């Protein structure tokens, strides 16, 4: 049974996401998980949306937004890409950007990055408070980017990569490759 307040929340975010959030909260209370799952925010200066000219029906559009938001790996990405091409024809760049950003979020969660924020000069990756593998990650960054990376070792560590040498159309691929490389190297002993 749900009260009107809970039903309103469920309607706003969708049944599947609501159930997952509820399940995670119960596990956290029972002590089955140590901390709340990280929710990564991505602030990248890029058009990332589903144009009405691509999907006109608002209900279908919301369903596609939910599917894109649920991307957790490359298999999910490929599955959604194929579904969109089958149902709606070729995918506009803004939708590809949206899918890429969702995939970037999934990679960032693995590294416990809670925020990715871009400005005109750099992109900043902020780790969750108390992140433990910071030395491994920073070692990789220094070996590859030397003068183009700034590292901060405080309680909430972050790194910033200067982006003035990266072309705008290559940015999302740069983020994906950087995060995949950091994940791979952080798993090495």
Model-derived features with residue positions:
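Accessory helical-bundle/CTD segments and flexible terminal tails appended to RecA-like ATPase motors
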Residues: 1-189
């Amino acid at each position: 049974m749900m009260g009107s307040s809970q039903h309103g929340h469920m309607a706003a975010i969708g049944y599947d996401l609501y159930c997952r959030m509820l399940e995670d909260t119960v596990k956290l209370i029972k002590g089955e998980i140590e901390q709340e799952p990280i929710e990564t925010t991505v602030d990248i200066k890029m058009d990332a949306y589903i144009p009405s000219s691509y999907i006109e029906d608002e209900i279908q559009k919301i369903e596609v937004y939910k599917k894109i938001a649920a991307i957790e790996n490359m298999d999910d990405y490929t599955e959604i890409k194929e579904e969109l091409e089958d149902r709606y024809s070729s995918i506009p760049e803004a939708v590809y950007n949206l899918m890429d950003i969702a995939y970037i979020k999934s990679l960032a969660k693995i590294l416990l990055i809670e925020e990715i924020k871009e400005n005109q000069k750099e992109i900043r990756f902020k780790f969750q408070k108390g992140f433990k593998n910071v030395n491994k990650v920073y070692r990789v960054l220094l070996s590859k980017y030397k003068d183009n990376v700034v590292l901060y070792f405080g309680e909430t560590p972050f790194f910033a990569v200067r982006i003035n040498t990266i072309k705008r159309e290559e940015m999302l691929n740069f983020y994906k490759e950087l995060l995949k490389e950091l994940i791979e190297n952080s798993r090495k002993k």
